[in-house]
Amino acid sequence: MRAFWGALPTEGRWLLSTVAIQTLGRGLTLPFTLIYLHEVRGFDLGLSGTLMALIAVVGFLVTGPGGALTDRYGARAVLLTGTAAMIAGNVLLAFATTPALAAVALVLVGFNFGVSWPGFNALIASVVSGDLRQQYFGINFALVNLGIGVGGVVGGLFADVSRPDTFTTIFLADAASGLIPMALLLGPLRHVHGRAAAPADGSPAPAAVGYLTILREPAVRWLTLLTFIGTFIGYGQHEAGFPGFARQAAEVSTRTIGLAFAVNTAIIVVLQFAVLSRISGRRRTRVMLVMAATWAVAWALLGLAGLAPGGLAAATGVIAFMGVFALGETLLQPTVPAMSNDLASDHTRGRYNALTAAAFQGGAIAGPVVAGFLLQHDLSVVYIALMVLGCAAIALVALVLERHVSATVNGQQTEPAAVGEGTPS
């Protein structure tokens, strides 16, 4: 860790040192927004769920334009706009007494999600490169989980449905957490815009390179597909499929589910650094194979929990699922973003990251829909089988992807990683 920190440029240190604090605000509200809309503001459950879906839908719709704007105007400008929308959205949500006002607030929050992913990843990639970039994405992921995990615990202890003002407070705190990245972007990082004004090799200017052109690259298509499948069977199941199976098939308590999420966060935070040292210099596609196998084991454990519902074995299986799944997450997060940014050139980085983000959001939307349908029709065995088949599909796609990327893009470094200082405006 000391060597990594020493290799980072000043801009990278600024970005990384505040990640956990920034995401703590999101953790305060993420698990409780639906509860707030339904139990505090009195919106019926169906309407509350529809309002929540606005975040994902709007995020998906603006990801493409967000990537193009990142390449045209720079990651810094896009992130400032997205963060301002997030702050406004959370302030509105804190006082949203009508569905219309809540809808406007959640659209603003969704807009931020949609434009921030390609923007933030592009900003990181403008600061660090090579194996250092892969390490950065992994450590950033661990810190994000730490912030959200701690925020969730604090929010759970503080929020009380019988005291609406406690929910107002946590949404205002989430808004306030957005002031940290804004201060960084307007202060120490004001010269890092994350934009290449013109490609040095004479290739088409940013406006001439569209998404269809990028998708004609086989490596991009396969990486996008892998990201979609990985999200569909992974994060797309965290908020619906996993809790639904745990309650319906395994018949465990909500406390057990909460403990499982806590174990998931703890393992990511504790193991991410060790995992990064083990995968450094190894082919990223082979790391994805290990991830697929790890997730297959995790889903099998959850399936076994459903065979002995309501007891200690079921609770153990549910918690073990999230623990083993976390190990797979530590393999996924450093590899896919790093590979996407290594495929991109400086003037297309925003759009490459936008494609990855769109695939992620597509999987996050489709995952709960499919899980809800299968579990509603008591097809829990089919559900687990589909998840395991998804793991096999990831392995197959990773092997195909390997044939379409260079050794450098696949994480094999022949020289020490270079460190960029960012592009001055």
Q: What does each of the following model-derived ranges do?
A:
Residues 62-74, 159, 270-285, 375:
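Helix-to-loop junctions at the C-terminal end of transmembrane segments
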Residues 1-11, 190-229, 415-424:
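Juxtamembrane intracellular "pre-TM" segments in multi-pass secondary transporters
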Residues 160-176, 373-392:
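A membrane-interface helix-boundary motif in multi-pass transporters
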Residues 77-92, 286-301:
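Structural signature of the two symmetry-related core transmembrane helices
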Residues 105-146:
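Cytoplasmic helix-loop-helix junction between adjacent transmembrane helices
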Residues 56-64, 149, 265-273, 364-365:
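Residue-level signature of mid-helix packing/kink "hotspots" within the transmembrane helices
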Residues 6-56, 220-262:
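Helix-loop boundary and gating motifs at the non-cytosolic
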Residues 156, 176-197, 396-402:
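C-terminal membrane-cytosol helix-exit motif in multi-pass small-molecule transporters
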